[in-house]
């Protein structure tokens, strides 16, 4: 999203009124444990392997993230299912999480080098996307930035770092739990807490922000909903039919074949 907005800004286009970043890395200075595994040799190997073509298998990507929390996401099921013969209980979030997708090899190689290795997105003009030089200083629009306190993929400090990069009016909110459960937290469940800091105050260190933030019970969704109302257009009636005109007809009932297809 950040690179798409930067491309549009470079072309003088501003079709977006506001943007929301959920557990997102833009500044890759703090990438947590993943930083241990990504160095020049690893990236060069991936560039040689698939930089000109091919795919990164979705299962390989899923395994990488699972082994960042091996006790919960790997060995827990080895012991319970393989050793004890227990059937894992249904878990909607993990079912969704297991639906991985393949990545184009050239994109994956580009991403590794320009983000995790060289952190080029925060260096004006260093990275190029769709023929345009990326300069996030031009992405001057209201943004809502959410980070999860126990996130093992996007550390809270990494999510917070976006407040130091994006120039527009910002709101940063921290939620309890991790990368997925922190985000998917419907208010009706009345679970967990979220933290909100002073309006417009973003010290450089995330720990300083946390020290002064106010803890509020329940989901952060209610805060986000109010923020969106202030940046959205007028409400309009929902369309009565699917598709749009003769050119964009509905293909089949939701959710569609692509949702059920395996990578």
Q: What do the PLM-derived regions correspond to, one by one?
A:
Residues 112, 162, 166-203:
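Catalytic histidine neighborhood in serine/cysteine hydrolases
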Residues 87-94, 139-141, 200-205:
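Short acidic (Asp/Glu) and glycine-rich catalytic loops that position anionic groups and cofactors
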Residues 139, 145-147, 151:
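Short beta-strand/loop motif that positions the catalytic acidic residue
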Residues 201-217, 221-225:
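A conserved mid-domain beta-alpha-beta active-site/ligand-binding segment of alpha/beta enzyme cores
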Residues 97-134, 141-142:
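Mobile cap/lid helix-loop segments that gate and shape the active-site cleft of serine hydrolases
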Residues 4-108, 119, 229-263:
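Alpha/beta-hydrolase-fold enzymes
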Residues 152-158:
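Conserved alpha/beta-hydrolase "acid-adjacent" motif
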């Amino acid at each position: 999203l950040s690179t798409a907005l930067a491309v549009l800004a470079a072309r003088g286009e501003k079709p977006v009124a506001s943007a929301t970043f959920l557990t997102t890395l833009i500044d890759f200075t703090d990438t947590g444990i993943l930083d241990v595994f990504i160095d020049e040799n690893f990236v060069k190997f991936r560039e040689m392997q698939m930089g000109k073509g091919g795919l990164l298998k979705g299962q390989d990507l899923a395994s990488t993230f699972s082994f960042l929390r091996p006790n919960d996401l790997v060995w827990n099921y080895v012991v319970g299912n393989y050793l004890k013969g227990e059937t894992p209980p249904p878990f909607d979030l993990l079912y969704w999480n297991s639906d991985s997708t393949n990545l184009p090899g050239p994109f994956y190689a580009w991403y590794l080098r320009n983000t995790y290795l060289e952190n080029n997105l925060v260096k004006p003009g260093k990275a190029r996307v769709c023929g345009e030089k990326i300069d996030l200083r031009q992405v001057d629009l209201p943004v809502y930035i959410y980070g999860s306190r126990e996130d093992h993929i996007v550390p809270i400090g990494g999510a917070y770092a976006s407040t130091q990069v994006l120039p527009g009016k910002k709101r940063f909110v921290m939620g309890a739990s991790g990368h997925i459960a922190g985000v998917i937290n419907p208010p009706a469940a009345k679970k967990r807490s979220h933290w909100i800091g002073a309006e417009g105050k973003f010290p450089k260190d995330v720990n300083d922000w946390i020290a002064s933030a106010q803890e509020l019970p329940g989901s952060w969704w209610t805060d986000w909903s109010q923020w969106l109302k202030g940046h959205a257009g007028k409400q309009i009636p929902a369309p009565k039919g699917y598709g749009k005109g003769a050119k964009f007809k509905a293909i089949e009932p939701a959710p569609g074949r692509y949702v059920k297809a395996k990578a």
